Amino acid sequence: MDVTIQHPWFKRALGPFYPSRLFDQFFGEGLFEYDLLPFLSSTISPYYRQSLFRTVLDSGISELMTHMWFVMHQPHAGNPKNNPGKVRSDRDKFVIFLDVKHFSPEDLTVKVLEDFVEIHGKHNERQDDHGYISREFHRRYRLPSNVDQSALSCSLSADGMLTFSGPKVQSGLDAGHSERAIPVSREEKPSSAPSS
C-alpha cells in the first residue's frame, strides 16, 4: 500500500512563500537579517539576497531588531520590577524576601494597608558604570488574616535583601488591622534569604 506524505497544513497554506530549507544550512555562522523574513527570502535568488536585504535593513530596522533581541534576552534578576521576591508563610511566621540592592533604606517605603503590605522604592537619577540611571518599583502582597500587624518588622541587609516579617497569632485573637508605615532598618550582615 502506497502512502502519500504531504507537507504540514501550515506549509501548504503559505505555498511558494514558505522556505523549504532551514536558514540555508549555515549553522555555524549565525543568522542573517533575511533569515528572519523567510517569505521574502525564498522568492529572491541567493545571489541578490545579501545586498538587497543589507540595503533595506541598513535603514534602521536592523538596529531595532538587534535592540529588541538584547532586551528580550538580558537577565532581570536584580530588578525588583521583574523580581517578585520570595514569600514564605509557615505555621507561626509570615516572611517576604525582596532583592532591592540598588536602594537604600531612605529610598524605600513600606506600608500596611488593611490586608496588604505595599513596598515602594524610588531613587533619583544617579551615576553608575554605564551612565545615569533612576529606578522605581512598587510591590503589593496580601497578608494572611492571622498575621499580627502590630508586630510587623522590616530590615535591609548589607547585600540588599529586604526582609519583611510578622508573627502569626492563634485563631480567635485580634490581628490588629490598621493602616501604618513600617520603618526599614539596616542590618550590617548579609541576608540569609533563600537563593533562586
UniProtKB/Swiss-Prot annotation:
Compositional bias of kind Basic and acidic residues: 176-190
Record-listed Zn(2+) 3 binding positions: 177
Glycosylation sites: 185
Region named Disordered: 168-196
Keyword Nucleus: yes
Compartments where found: Cytoplasm; Nucleus
Keywords, alphabetical: Acetylation, Chaperone, Cytoplasm, Eye lens protein, Glycoprotein, Metal-binding, Methylation, Nucleus, Phosphoprotein, Zinc
Molecular function as annotated in GO: identical protein binding; metal ion binding; structural constituent of eye lens; structural molecule activity; unfolded protein binding
Residue spans crossing the bilayer: none
Binding site for Zn(2+) 2: 130
Tissue-level expression: Highly expressed in eye lens. Also expressed in non-lenticular tissues such as brain, spleen, liver, lung, skin, small intestine and a several epithelial and fibroblast cell lines with highest levels in spleen.
One Pfam assignment: Crystallin
Modification Deamidated glutamine, positions: 6, 50, 170
Entry-annotated residues carrying N-acetylmethionine: 1
Modified residues (N6-acetyllysine): 93, 122
Post-translational modification: Acetylation at Lys-93 may increase chaperone activity.
Span list, region Required for complex formation with BFSP1 and BFSP2: 1-63
Function description: Contributes to the transparency and refractive index of the lens. Acts as a chaperone, preventing aggregation of various proteins under a wide range of stress conditions. Required for the correct formation of lens intermediate filaments as part of a complex composed of BFSP1, BFSP2 and CRYAA.
Entry's family note: Belongs to the small heat shock protein (HSP20) family.
Protein's recorded name: Alpha-crystallin A chain
Organism: Rattus norvegicus
Gene: Cryaa
